[in-house]
Swiss-Prot record:
Naturally occurring in which organism (per UniProt): Pan troglodytes
Biological process per Gene Ontology, one example term: N-glycan processing
MF annotations from Gene Ontology: alpha-N-acetylneuraminate alpha-2,8-sialyltransferase activity; nucleotide binding
Main localisation: Golgi
Protein name: Alpha-2,8-sialyltransferase 8B
Residues listed as glycosylation sites in the UniProt record: 60, 72, 89, 134, 219, 234
Signal peptide: none
Length: 375
C-alpha cells in the first residue's frame, strides 16, 4: 500500500511539473506578444532553450538586446553597393546551417507529406488555436508524397523580396543566373523582368494574396488571371501556408480546386505546423526579437539548408532609399505599409538589421541598389 501511495505521489508531482512548464511557456509567449518583442524576451527565450541550443553567430554585434531604431538611420545606411568586394564566408554559412538544424529541418518542414494526414483530419490553426479546419480531399490530393527538396543542394540561391527598391536595379539577369530562385507571394515578373528576372523555382502564396491581387476571384476574369499566373510557374514549387489562420481557409481551397481542375503544372507544398515557431525560436535565441517572421526571413532560414551561397534582392523595409529617393512598398503595386507600426505583425527594420549584419560577415549577400552590369 505504501509503495502504491508513493507511485501516486510521484505521478502527481510529474503532472504538476509539466503543468508549470507549459504555464511558463504560455506566460512567455504572452509577454512577447504584449511587448512587441523587446525588453525581457532574451531571458524568456533562454529559459526555454538549453545552453546547447543557443546560437553562437554574432548577428546584432553586441550582447545587448536588439531594439528597433525607430529612425531607421543606423540600420539602413552603409550597405555596400553591388560592385563592392563581398566575399562569401563558407565557415560561417555552415555554422548557421548547423545551428538552424537544431530548430528545424527545411527538407522536412517545407511541407506536410501525404502519409501524415488523411481527408477529414482536424488541424488547429497556428494563429487561431481555438479554430480548426478539416483536411479536404483537394488538399490531401495535392500534398506531396516526398519533400520537394529531398536531397537537393544548390550552389547559389536568390531570394527575391518585393520591395520597390528593385525598380531600375537591372538585377533580372543576375537573379536568373542563380541555381535556384525563390520568390514571394506570387509577385508578377513578366512586366518587370529587367529588374526582377523571370526564373522561378519556388514561390510562396499567402492566402491574403488572393484577396489583394486577385479580388477574391469574384468573377471569371479574376479566376483566369490567377490561372494564367499559376500556369506560368511551369513546374515550380508553390508554397502555400494553409494552416496559419482560419481567414485563409476558403482562399486556399479555391486555389487547390483551380490547380486540380485545370491540371496546373506546379508542385504544391504546405509548410509544417511547427515551422513558424521554430524559425522564430532560432532568431530569438540570436537576439533578433521579431514578432512574426516575414516571408522573406522564413525563406532565408529555410534556404540555409540547401543553398551554399544565398543572395537577397528586394529586401528594403524603408520608404526612402540610401539617396533619399522614395521607395514603393511593393515594386508592382501602390500598397502602403507602416514599417515601424506597433500594429504590424512583423518587425521588418529589425529583420533587415540582422540580415545586414550577416551580409557584412559574408554569410549572405544583400543587394539593395543596382546590380553589376545594369544600365
Amino acid at each position: 500500500m505504501q509503495l502504491q501511495f508513493r507511485s501516486w505521489m510521484l505521478a502527481a508531482l510529474t503532472l504538476l511539473v509539466v503543468f508549470l512548464i507549459f504555464a511558463d511557456i504560455s506566460e512567455i509567449e504572452e509577454e512577447i506578444g504584449n511587448s512587441g518583442g523587446r525588453g525581457t524576451i532574451r531571458s524568456a527565450v533562454n529559459s526555454l532553450h538549453s545552453k546547447s541550443n543557443r546560437a553562437e553567430v554574432v548577428i546584432n554585434g553586441s550582447s545587448s538586446p536588439a531594439v528597433v531604431d525607430r529612425s531607421n538611420e543606423s540600420i539602413k545606411h552603409n550597405i555596400q553597393p553591388a560592385s563592392s568586394k563581398w566575399r562569401h564566408n563558407q565557415t560561417l554559412s555552415l555554422r548557421i546551417r548547423k545551428q538552424i538544424l537544431k530548430f528545424l529541418d527545411a527538407e522536412k518542414d517545407i511541407s506536410v507529406l501525404k502519409g501524415t494526414l488523411k481527408p477529414g483530419d482536424i488541424i488547429h490553426y497556428i494563429f487561431d488555436r481555438d479554430s480548426t479546419m478539416n483536411v479536404s480531399q483537394n488538399l490531401y490530393e495535392l500534398l506531396p508524397r516526398t519533400s520537394p527538396l529531398k536531397n537537393k543542394h544548390f550552389g547559389t540561391c536568390a531570394i527575391v523580396g518585393n520591395s520597390g527598391v528593385l525598380l531600375n536595379s537591372g538585377c533580372g539577369q543576375e537573379i536568373d543566373a542563380h541555381s535556384f530562385v525563390i520568390r514571394c507571394n506570387l509577385a508578377p515578373v513578366q512586366e518587370y523582368a529587367r529588374d526582377v528576372g523571370l526564373k522561378t523555382d519556388l514561390v510562396t502564396m499567402n492566402p491574403s494574396v488572393i484577396q489583394r491581387a486577385f479580388e477574391d476571384l469574384v468573377n471569371a476574369t479574376w479566376r483566369e488571371k490567377l490561372l494564367q499566373r499559376l500556369h506560368s510557374l511551369n513546374g515550380s514549387i508553390l508554397w502555400i501556408p494553409a494552416f496559419m489562420a482560419r481567414g485563409g481557409k476558403e482562399r486556399v481551397e479555391w486555389v487547390n480546386e483551380l490547380i486540380l481542375k485545370h491540371h496546373v503544372n506546379v508542385r504544391t507544398a504546405y509548410p509544417s505546423l511547427p515551422l513558424l515557431h521554430a524559425v522564430r525560436g532560432y532568431w530569438l535565441t540570436n537576439k533578433v526579437h521579431i514578432k512574426r517572421p516575414t516571408t522573406g526571413l522564413l525563406m532565408y532560414t529555410l534556404a540555409t539548408r540547401f543553398c551554399n551561397q544565398i543572395y537577397l534582392y528586394g529586401f528594403w523595409p524603408f520608404p526612402l532609399d540610401q539617396n533619399q529617393n522614395p521607395v514603393k512598398y511593393h515594386y508592382y503595386d501602390s500598397l502602403k505599409y507602416g514599417y515601424t507600426s506597433q500594429a504590424s505583425p512583423h518587425t521588418m527594420p529589425l529583420e533587415f538589421k540582422a540580415l545586414k549584419s550577416l551580409h557584412e560577415q559574408g554569410a549572405l549577400k544583400l543587394t539593395v541598389g543596382q546590380c553589376d552590369g545594369a544600365t
